[in-house]
Amino acid sequence: MLLPDWKIRKEILIEPFSEESLQPAGYDLRVGREAFVSGKLIDVEKEGKVVIPPREYALILTLERVKLPDDVMGDMKIRSSLAREGILGSFAWVDPGWDGNLTLMLYNASNEPVELKYGERFVQIVFIRLEDPPRNPYSGNYQGSTRLVFSKRKKL
């Protein structure tokens, strides 16, 4: 079952919370302070924006910390306005028990650069209640992330 807006406000810890980002059945996550594009770490908060060149990918940190109860998971989709500009997103499930900022991958499939401003809404997360809590909520490598995190599989 997807959580409606009033249950999201009541049951999901989102910091900093924005009323503008709360949707009827989800929450729009915003561009955070760090990004990784073209082999470079970008201070998005300082620069005010991040630009994703054509046919390149970017890792973007969310502004929000999201803390999920043990019986709720998250699923994310790119906002349709960005999809219409050629941005694709590849996102993992947000496991029950997750706590931290999220590092998300976007790909610019267009022939034009796409600019994202610091604090801009770019991905919607919906929250799904499980029938029962898992025996082992998430406690993996990325738990507690507050900075952009690269893959633990490979060193950059």
From Swiss-Prot:
Function: Catalyzes the deamination of dCTP to dUTP.
Family matches, as Gene3D superfamilies: 2.70.40.10
Domain of life: Archaea
Pfam families in alphabetical order: DCD
Assembly and binders: Homotrimer.
Catalytically driven reaction(s): dCTP + H2O + H(+) = dUTP + NH4(+)
Keyword Transferase: no
Residues involved in dCTP binding: R79, S80, S81, L82, A83, R84, D95, Q124, Y138
Identification of the protein by name: dCTP deaminase
One GO BP: dUMP biosynthetic process
Similarity section: Belongs to the dCTP deaminase family.
GO molecular function, one term: dCTP deaminase activity
InterPro entries found in the cross-reference section: dCTP_deaminase, dUTPase-like_sf, dUTPase_trimeric
Source species: Pyrococcus horikoshii (strain ATCC 700860 / DSM 12428 / JCM 9974 / NBRC 100139 / OT-3)
UniProt lineage: Archaea, Methanobacteriati, Methanobacteriota, Thermococci, Thermococcales
UniProt keyword terms in alphabetical order: Hydrolase, Nucleotide metabolism, Nucleotide-binding
EC number: 3.5.4.13
Pathway entry: Pyrimidine metabolism; dUMP biosynthesis; dUMP from dCTP (dUTP route): step 1/2
